[in-house]
């Protein structure tokens, strides 16, 4: 994040609400989080301290007048500067006791949320720790009214909170006292402990004096104090964020540096009751849960929060494990059909991976309820995949197209594709428009899908030698057969794994001779015929010829079109009709011989078109 975002604000109903944009940021953070929150009276410089922890001059808004800038709770996430693989989450809260708001209940909620969400709580105040400062920290005495460790109200006491509450840091701003007691120097922590010292007695006055101190001592056994001198002169306070380090008091900078180092070194990763590590995703869910509790008027219960979080995380862990399993099985599915042993082996491997993914995210699944749910769902999916593997392995009927490409040497193309697959049939006919179709019997036995089949043709070369697999999800593959001498051709299609013959036919030599005669008869023979045919159908050539590139290559190879025109029509971005117009213009201007050669090329490349045009003349 390059700047803070609002995490908790006030909704239209006047209640606190979580901002969806901030939740989305937290949902993306899978790392453990260290959460540092700052609370304190408004206009005491909380945001300045947070910006220093972020290593920035600006970020969290600073106010230069009596109106506070921060409202609700703002969040800034960044990589932890000293703990690898950890995210630092800074929470800046709105100032307490804002005279404009005048809502003590809201202040208590803000303070309670800061305590519940943070692993380190920074309390920021001005001056010294005296009775006034303690009175301003009244919210700590109210924590026990709003937060409970267990649902059993009688079981809670102040000491129970200490295990789950954050490290407490009291930052005293504009501190001017000399740290001495009875002539002896005091450390900042010793000063804090002196200020928290209890008075003996049971009078109401003594009890009122001791109450906030006793709560701090019991709620926050881990506590620290930092005393900051004034950062600059009074007239420059309004532009504090724009001042360079050279313009700030050196002692203030030294304390700030110590404070930041302490926070980075001592702040622990946030944990739930029971020791579960909090990630950004979990922090987002906790925030939503706590704010919803406030809206309902209920009391925060740490144990209930853990139970609710366990439910959320374990359901998500189940889904995560299931996705790991499904991704792997879907990949395996592309190779169906497979032996059942292979499918079962992959099921076991992926089940183990899915369980590991589940265990990495789940917590407190003590009865194994969610793990059993994951195993049950994987079992259902396995049954479905096993059934699909069996279905894919079923036999299905196919169609066959056979073409003669040329007679000397004899070259045949043999295509297989599903029965009634019009798209595949059209594709094959388009590819073979210059070939001659051969009549043949349709296969009367079904083929096994995705299983290799080999075509046996005695006395001929067949490619691919390893065979082809019959598939329903790709364009039809084909065998290429080459035979030097034209005689009877026997074909036998064999399923490779069990050597079963699924189709056989014989094509007699006379059929090939007849096909060649048909091809020869269809050709335009005399120069006069070809010249007249060109002149009659020039417009049709421009509009209907499709193999433009192949025709241009042959025309250029026979020097019918010159190099400059060939480069122009093959390298520029023009339409097929524009190219054919240029070709026809060039052929037309070159005379009868060029027209004859052009028609010869068309008889090779556009046989169907020429036959159609000849039929239209009759």
Curated annotation (Swiss-Prot):
Keyword tags: Cytoplasm, GTP-binding, Hydrolase, Immunity, Inflammasome, Inflammatory response, Innate immunity, Nucleotide-binding
Cytoplasm in keyword set: yes
InterPro entries listed in its UniProt record: CARD (IPR001315), CARD8/ASC/NALP1_CARD (IPR033516), DEATH-like_dom_sf (IPR011029), G_GB1_RHD3_dom (IPR030386), Guanylate-bd/ATL_C (IPR003191), Guanylate-bd_C_sf (IPR036543), Guanylate-bd_N (IPR015894), P-loop_NTPase (IPR027417)
Positions of the CARD domain: 526-617
Subcellular location: Inflammasome
Biological processes per GO annotation: defense response to bacterium; inflammatory response; innate immune response; neutrophil homeostasis; neutrophil-mediated killing of bacterium; regulation of apoptotic process
Region entry Disordered, spans: 428-448
Main location: other
Pfam families recorded: CARD (PF00619), GBP (PF02263), GBP_C (PF02841), UPA-FIIND (PF23679)
PROSITE patterns (UniProt xref): CARD, G_GB1_RHD3
Tissue: Highly expressed in neutrophils.
CDD domains hit by this protein: CARD_ASC_NALP1, GBP
Similarity field: Belongs to the TRAFAC class dynamin-like GTPase superfamily. GB1/RHD3 GTPase family. GB1 subfamily.
Primary role: GTPase that plays important roles in innate immunity against S.typhimurium pathogens by mediating formation of an inflammasome in neutrophils. Neutrophils are recruited to the infection site, and then mediate bacterial clearance through the Gbp4 inflammasome-dependent biosynthesis of prostaglandin D2.
Name of protein: Guanylate-binding protein 4
């Amino acid at each position: 994040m390059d700047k803070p975002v609002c995490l908790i604000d006030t909704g239209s109903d006047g209640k606190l609400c979580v901002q969806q944009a901030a939740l989305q940021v937290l949902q993306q953070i899978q790392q453990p989080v260290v959460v540092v929150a700052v609370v304190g009276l408004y206009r005491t410089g909380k945001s300045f301290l947070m910006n220093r922890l972020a290593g920035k001059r600006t970020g969290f808004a600073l106010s230069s007048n009596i109106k506070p800038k921060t409202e609700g709770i703002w969040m800034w996430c960044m990589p932890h500067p000293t703990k690898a693989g950890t995210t630092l989450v800074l929470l800046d809260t709105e100032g307490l006791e804002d005279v404009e708001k005048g809502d003590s209940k809201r202040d208590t909620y803000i303070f309670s949320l800061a305590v519940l969400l943070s692993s380190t709580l920074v309390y920021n105040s001005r001056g010294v720790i005296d009775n006034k400062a303690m009175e301003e920290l009244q919210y700590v005495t109210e924590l026990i009214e709003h937060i409970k460790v267990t649902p059993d109200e009688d079981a809670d006491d102040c000491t129970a909170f200490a295990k789950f509450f954050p490290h407490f840091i009291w930052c005293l701003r504009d501190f001017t006292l000399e740290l001495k007691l009875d002539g002896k120097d005091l450390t900042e922590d010793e000063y804090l402990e002196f200020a928290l010292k209890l008075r003996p007695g049971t009078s109401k006055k003594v009890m009122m004096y001791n109450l906030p101190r006793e709560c701090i001592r019991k709620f926050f056994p881990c506590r620290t104090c930092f005393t900051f001198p004034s950062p600059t002169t009074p007239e420059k306070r309004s532009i504090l964020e724009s001042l360079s380090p050279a313009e700030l008091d050196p002692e203030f900078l030294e304390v700030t540096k110590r404070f930041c180092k302490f926070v980075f070194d001592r702040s622990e990763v946030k944990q739930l009751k029971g020791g579960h590590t909090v990630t950004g995703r979990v922090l987002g869910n906790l925030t939503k849960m706590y704010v919803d509790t406030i809206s309902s008027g209920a009391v925060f219960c740490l144990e209930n929060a853990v139970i609710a979080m366990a439910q959320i995380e374990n359901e998500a862990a189940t889904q995560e494990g299931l996705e790991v399993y499904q991704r792997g099985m879907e990949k395996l599915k592309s190779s169906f059909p497979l032996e059942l042993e292979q499918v079962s082996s992959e099921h076991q491997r992926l089940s183990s991976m899915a369980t590991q993914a589940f265990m990495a995210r789940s917590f407190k699944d003590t009865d194994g309820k969610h793990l059993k749910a994951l195993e049950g769902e994987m079992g259902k999916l396995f049954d479905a995949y096993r059934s699909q593997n069996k279905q894919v392995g079923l036999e299905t009927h196919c169609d066959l197209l056979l073409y003669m490409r040329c007679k000397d040497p004899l070259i045949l193309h043999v295509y297989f594709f599903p029965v009634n697959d019009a798209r595949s049939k059209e594709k094959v006919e388009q590819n073979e428009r210059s070939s001659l179709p051969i009549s043949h019997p349709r296969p009367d036995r079904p083929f096994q899908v995705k299983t290799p089949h080999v075509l046996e043709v005695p006395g001929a070369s067949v490619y691919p030698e390893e065979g082809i697999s019959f598939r329903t999800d790709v364009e039809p593959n084909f065998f290429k057969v080459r035979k030097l001498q034209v005689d009877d051709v026997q074909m036998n299609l064999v399923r490779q794994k069990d050597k079963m013959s699924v189709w056989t036919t014989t094509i007699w030599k006379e059929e090939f001779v007849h096909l060649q005669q048909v091809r020869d008869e269809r050709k335009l023979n005399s120069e006069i015929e070809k010249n007249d045919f060109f002149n009659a159908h020039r417009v049709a050539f421009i509009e209907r010829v499709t193999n433009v590139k192949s025709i241009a290559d042959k025309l250029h190879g026979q020097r019918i079109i010159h190099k400059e025109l060939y480069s122009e029509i093959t390298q520029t971005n023009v339409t097929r009709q524009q190219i054919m117009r240029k070709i026809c213009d060039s052929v037309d201007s070159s005379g009868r011989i060029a027209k004859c050669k052009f028609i010869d090329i068309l008889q090779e490349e556009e046989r169907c078109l020429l036959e159609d045009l000849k039929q239209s003349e009759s």
